[in-house]
From Swiss-Prot:
Organism superkingdom: Eukaryota
GO cellular component: nucleus
Keywords: Coiled coil, Nucleus, Phosphoprotein
Compartments, as annotated in UniProt: Nucleus
Low complexity bias: start-end ranges: 423-446
Biased composition (Polar residues): 406-415
Predominant cellular place of this UniProt entry's protein: nucleus
Coiled-coil residues: 64-99, 268-310
Biased segments, Acidic residues type: 136-147
Record protein name field: Coiled-coil domain-containing protein 174
Role according to the record: Probably involved in neuronal development.
Length: 467
């Protein structure tokens, strides 16, 4: 069939709509053209952009939301049913507690004995009612006692036993016997003094002008009193004028009256003398006790000294007691004569002044520590004989050493004299020994011995051994 000859199924209304749409588009085009010619840009056209990931919803969100809404409706129905059941149970429980049972057979079905509960509750109510009635009766009795008139009080046999009324410091009306009235009034005065409000607290409620006026009045009153008084010395209390400074516990505020001030000063002086006397007495008692203790310690030391002398260990006893004999003052060592170039080198061995005779030297950091100093069980010669010759010092260290001072015949019995015996050798007959004596009875120490060396090497080797 030919297309040109095919009739179009077009109605009149569709043609009118098409013509109207065409006319509207032509008008919009004209308006945009006029705006462009005038330089005014119209509203930009909206462009459909790609939706972002945040605006895009997950698949199945709407279906899940519908399911949630249905589930909420079901839950709400279940909750409503449970609430209705609970309300029915509560109403039934109230009826049963009141005793409104439907039937006795129904009562046996429940595990709770509601009849016994009703009986117990009624008993509790009766007890509470009885206690309330007793309290009400007691209150009435108290009111009746308070409302007794003077006619109900019997006449007193003695005028001092007469009942009287008075008002205390707090504004309360009181009743007591006439004989007790003075003591009660005195107590009331004491209470009123304790409850007195200080003027400083009252002044906080005043304005600045009123406070200044009060200060001016106080100053005028003080000046009038000062004019009435005779001329005399001015004290600190006269010029303090309510100073806010705190002066500490050592400060005493004397009275402004001369007689009272002198009396206070005499009292303070007397107290000071008493304190001084008590302090002196305590010092004297302390000194007496200390002297008695020292005397007892001296007796104990003497006893131990006697025992140690008998045993031949006098020094050990003194060390155990912590008593050390005072060292005798060493005689001044004569200065060595000037040495010639080819003469021998002389070395003078001096005593250590920081140690006591017969007592080993104790370092400062070792004071107060306990040390046990025993005796040599063997002689020095025996020990040197037992020593391995491999560990002995070389014999050439002591070649040419000669002792000019006489050797001490008394052997050393304590290891405290070891520092002076370090230079001994097994092959030498003449050995430098300590010049200290172990007997504390000696009043003066001997002169320091001198050692003569032929060469400087001998002297250095000797000092290596000694130190």
């Amino acid at each position: 069939m030919d297309r040109k000859k095919k009739p179009l199924d077009v109605t009149a209304s569709s043609l009118v709509d098409l013509k109207a749409e065409l006319f509207r588009k032509q008008e919009e085009f004209k308006q945009e053209k006029l705006l462009k010619d005038s330089g005014v840009f119209g509203k930009p056209k909206t462009i459909n952009k790609k939706p972002s990931i945040w605006s895009k919803q997950n698949a199945g969100v709407t279906s899940r939301a519908e399911k949630d809404a249905e589930q909420k409706l079901e839950e709400q129905k279940t909750l409503d049913k449970a609430r209705e059941k609970l309300e029915e149970k509560a109403k039934l429980y109230e009826k049963m507690t009141k005793g409104d049972f439907l039937d006795e057979e129904v009562e046996d079905m429940y595990l709770v004995d509601f009849t016994q509960k009703i009986i117990v509750k009624r008993k509790e109510m009766e007890v509470l009612g009885a206690t309330r009635e007793s309290q009400i009766e007691e209150e009435r009795d108290d009111d009746d006692k308070e409302e007794f008139s003077d006619k109900d009080i019997p006449p007193p046999q003695d005028p001092s036993e007469e009942w009287v009324d008075y008002v205390d410091s707090l504004g309360r009306s009181r009743r007591c016997m006439r004989k007790d009235l003075p003591s009660l009034l005195e107590m009331d005065k004491n209470l009123q003094g304790r409850l007195f409000v200080s003027p400083a607290n009252e002044k906080t409620l005043l304005s600045e002008d009123m406070r200044k006026e009060l200060q001016r009045q106080q100053w005028e009153e003080e000046e009038r009193e000062a004019l009435k008084k005779p001329m005399g010395p001015i004290h600190y209390e006269d010029i303090r004028e309510n100073e806010a400074r705190q002066l500490g516990v050592g400060y005493f505020a004397f009275a402004r009256d001369k007689e009272l001030r002198n009396k206070q000063m005499k009292t303070l002086e007397m107290l000071r003398e008493q304190t001084t006397d008590q302090r002196i007495k305590r010092e004297n008692i302390k000194e007496k006790r200390k002297a008695m203790l020292e005397a007892r310690l001296a007796k104990l030391r003497q006893k131990k000294m006697k025992k140690s002398k008998e045993d031949g260990t006098e020094e050990e006893g003194r060390e155990a007691d912590g008593v050390v004999p005072e060292p005798s003052e060493p005689k001044p060592v004569p200065a060595p004569a000037p040495v010639a170039q080819n003469s021998k080198v002389e070395v003078i061995i001096q005593e250590r002044r920081d140690t006591k005779p017969g007592v080993p030297h104790i370092r400062e950091w070792d004071r107060g520590k306990d040390f046990s100093f025993g005796f040599w069980s063997k002689k020095q010669s025996e020990l040197r004989a037992e020593r391995d010759p491999e560990f002995a010092p070389p014999s050439n260290y002591f070649v040419g050493q000669k002792r000019t001072a006489p050797m001490s015949s008394q052997p050393q019995s304590r290891p405290g004299s070891a520092p002076s015996d370090l230079g001994h050798s097994s092959g030498q007959s003449q050995e430098p020994s300590s010049s200290h004596t172990s007997t504390p009875a000696s009043e003066s120490s001997p002169q320091a011995p001198t050692v003569t060396f032929q060469t400087l090497d001998d002297m250095i080797s000797y000092y290596k051994q000694v130190t």
